[in-house]
């Protein structure tokens, strides 16, 4: 069974997102062990300077780095990453399990994204879209896609 660790910046406060996240965590239980770890979120001023942006990204990146399980296959969610279909994601997860890589960390950045050093350390940079999504919403989208991937792997009804 895969162990999935979602490392995300900040907390989710919106009740509708919390409810959706809890629902997909429950749905994923038969397929994988999933936990969400939260790195501290830095306050972002309205118009941060380039140096301020780098400082915030570095600080959040250090927090993320402390939470990534050692020897895990790391996936950084990045708008500039590779785009996969749901079927391709299902295949990648199956391939990881077959290769004995049972520990997977999926990293969601904060408001400004991810520090360069986190992106460089990732085994895979994955994009869900060229659009920018709120990082809190991305947790729900990621969990739904993981659930869909496991349903596809098993040939169970859900994916259309």
UniProtKB/Swiss-Prot annotation:
Primary location: cytoplasm
Keywords attached to this entry: Cytoplasm, Methyltransferase, rRNA processing, S-adenosyl-L-methionine, Transferase
EC number assigned by the record: 2.1.1.177
Positions of transmembrane segments: none
Compartments it resides in: Cytoplasm
Entries under Pfam families matching the protein: SPOUT_MTase (PF02590)
Signal peptide range in chain numbering: none
SUPFAM superfamilies: alpha/beta knot
Catalytic activity: pseudouridine(1915) in 23S rRNA + S-adenosyl-L-methionine = N(3)-methylpseudouridine(1915) in 23S rRNA + S-adenosyl-L-homocysteine + H(+)
A cellular component term, taken from the record's GO annotations: cytoplasm
Binding residues for S-adenosyl-L-methionine: 77, 109
Family: Belongs to the RNA methyltransferase RlmH family.
Chain's role: Specifically methylates the pseudouridine at position 1915 (m3Psi1915) in 23S rRNA.
Subunit record text: Homodimer.
Protein name, per record: Ribosomal RNA large subunit methyltransferase H
Organism in which the protein naturally occurs: Moorella thermoacetica (strain ATCC 39073 / JCM 9320)
Phylogenetic placement of the source organism: Bacteria, Bacillati, Bacillota, Clostridia, Moorellales
């Amino acid at each position: 069974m895969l162990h999935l660790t979602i490392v995300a910046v900040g907390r989710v406060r919106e009740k509708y997102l919390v409810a959706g996240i809890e629902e997909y965590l429950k749905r994923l239980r038969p397929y994988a062990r999933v936990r969400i770890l939260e790195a501290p979120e830095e306050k972002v001023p309205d118009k941060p300077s380039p140096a301020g942006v780098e400082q915030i990204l570095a600080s959040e990146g250090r927090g993320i780095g402390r939470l990534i399980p050692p020897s895990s296959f790391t996936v950084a969610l990045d708008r500039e990453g590779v785009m996969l279909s749901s079927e391709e994601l299902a295949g990648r997860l199956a391939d990881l399990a077959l290769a004995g890589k049972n520990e997977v960390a999926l990293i969601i950045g904060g408001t400004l994204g991810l520090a360069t050093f986190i992106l460089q350390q990732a085994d895979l940079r994955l994009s869900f879209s060229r659009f920018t999504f709120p990082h809190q919403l991305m947790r729900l989208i990621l969990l739904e896609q993981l659930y869909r991937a496991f349903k596809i792997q098993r040939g169970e009804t859900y994916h259309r």
